[in-house]
UniProtKB/Swiss-Prot annotation:
This is Lactaldehyde dehydrogenase. Optimum pH is 9. The activity remained constant to pH 10.0. Below pH 9, the activity gradually declined, and the enzyme was inactive at pH 6 or below. It comes from Methanocaldococcus jannaschii (strain ATCC 43067 / DSM 2661 / JAL-1 / JCM 10045 / NBRC 100440) (Methanococcus jannaschii). It catalyses: (S)-lactaldehyde + NAD(+) + H2O = (S)-lactate + NADH + 2 H(+). GO terms for molecular function: lactaldehyde dehydrogenase (NAD+) activity. Pathway: Cofactor biosynthesis; coenzyme F420 biosynthesis. The keyword Transit peptide does not apply.
Length: 463
């Protein structure tokens, strides 16, 4: 952990390689009292960050991006070992994180305040930092989703208290070293960024309830997100949570395009992406053909060691999660689901699994965070109703060549994002991103996160 510019090295908590199941490192786990002391210390730097010149913010962000680029392969290998992410997918995450820090640097200089028309007053606004941002980040994109919280926090002049997932913290430790170097280079006190490792129910909980923390930016499960809304009090909160993301294939869709996109959207990082394909709704008139093509493509995916360049699907984050997924699939079959492919587990590896189900099946209501895909044969009239029937509303997708139908679905789907002719997995780091219902509050995407992490002050001058 890194607190007030000092590294604290203890061996309190094991970090497990999800593929080999070996202990790869032992890291500190803060007590609640230590977390509280760290937040007390961080508070001293609020004025430092608030008054940090725009040019310094820009330079720090660009320097972080530069250092990440220099360590691209090293960071990708850490992601593969620590989070179980196939190496070719890990490289993509590192590249995206470089872009995220550069985006924040761009928006630092592009920010504009507003002048409000008035007959006899000069009225203008300015955005001010909230103070301390508690950034609580997940295991599945530990580098880029940390970037999505840290970069806009720096850009808006906030102090950061960063709590990474205990399941994949190692790349965040390396990121903290990179941030330390950037702060030193531009003579900024190191206490403006703090990395607090440990158990979520201890460290994460203290960040949420501590009155000195002004905002929580959390990515994780809807269950934990709901707890945060109950505990955070009057803090600002931005929650990017889960989903069972429906992907709709209409009868006029380009099937080759749909199948290729849905294979990627279903099985990248073993389905451990909040916007992975959650269920596929396919028009019954083309269902046989679609299912045959989809299953055949999934059959040839390579499952195995994340460090192998040929691996498409690596392990789930833990054996415990894989065992839970196995039970959910068994229940789905008990409820009448027809297993078309997979259903096999080997330790934390879960093989690509496809089932044909009806709309009431457990898989259509449960975020498995796994390479498990339910397919529903249905008709166009029922698709929107089925898609909107979940308690989530993160991303959805539709495949069609009819522009009128695509717009009709886009207007009626109750989701934060609707992707047309690509899978729900699509996300670009400069677009607004987030969900409705139990999928979250607020929006990420650097520009939009900067708005979340600042407060508008209105200044009125009488003539």
């Amino acid at each position: 952990m890194f607190i007030d510019g000092k590294w604290i090295n203890r061996e309190d908590m094991d970090v497990i390689n999800p593929y080999s199941l070996e202990v790869i490192k032992k890291i500190p786990a803060l007590s609640r009292e230590e977390a509280k002391e760290a937040i007390d210390t961080a508070e001293k730097y609020k004025e430092v960050m608030k008054n940090l010149p725009i040019t310094k913010r820009y330079n720090i962000l660009m320097n972080i991006a530069k250092q990440i680029k220099e360590k691209k392969e090293e960071l990708a290998k850490i992601l593969a070992i620590d989070a179980g992410k196939p190496i070719k997918q890990a490289r993509v995450e590192v590249e995206r994180s470089i872009g995220t820090f550069k985006l924040a640097a761009f928006y630092v200089k592009e920010h504009r305040d507003e002048v409000i028309p008035s007959d006899d007053r000069l009225i203008f606004t300015r955005r001010e930092p909230v103070g301390i941002v508690g950034a609580i980040t997940p295991f599945n994109f530990p580098l880029n989703l940390s970037a999505h919280k840290i970069a806009p926090a720096i850009a808006t002049g906030n102090v950061i208290v960063h709590h990474p997932s205990s399941k994949a913290p190692l790349v965040c430790i390396e990121l903290a070293k990179i941030i330390e170097n950037a702060l030193k280079k531009y003579n900024v006190p190191l206490g403006v960024y703090n990395l607090l490792t440990g158990a979520g129910e201890v460290v994460g909980d203290e960040i949420v309830v501590n009155e000195k923390v002004n905002m929580i930016s959390f990515t994780g499960s809807s269950k934990v997100g709901e707890l945060i809304t109950k505990k955070a009090g009057f803090k600002k909160i931005a929650l990017e949570l889960g989903g069972v993301n429906p992907n709709i294939v209409l009868k006029d869709a380009d099937l080759n395009k749909a199948v290729n996109a849905l294979i990627k959207g279903s099985f990248i990082y073993a389905g451990q992406v909040c916007i992975s394909v959650g269920m596929i709704l396919v028009d019954e008139s083309i269902a046989d053909k679609f299912i045959e093509m989809f299953v055949n493509k999934a059959k040839v995916l390579n499952v195995g060691n994340p460090l192998d360049e040929k691996t498409d699907v690596g392990p789930l984050i833990s054996v415990e999660h894989a065992e839970w997924v196995e039970k959910v699939v068994e229940k789905a079959i008990d409820e009448g689901g027809k297993l078309l492919l997979g259903g096999k587990r080997d330790k934390a590896l879960f093989y690509p699994t496809i089932l044909e189900v009806d709309r009431d099946n457990i898989l259509c209501k449960t975020e498995t965070f796994a390479p498990v895909i339910p397919i529903i044969r249905t008709n166009e009239e029922e698709m929107i109703d089925i898609a909107n029937s979940t308690e989530y509303g993160l991303h959805s997708a539709i495949f069609t060549n009819d522009i009128n139908k695509s717009l009709k679905f886009a207007e009626n789907l109750e989701f934060g994002g609707v992707v047309i002719n690509d899978s729900s997995l699509f996300r670009q780091d400069n677009m607004p991103f987030g969900g409705v219902k139990k999928s979250g509050l607020g929006r990420e995407g650097v520009k939009y996160a900067m708005e979340e992490m600042s407060n508008i002050k209105t200044i009125i001058i009488s003539k």
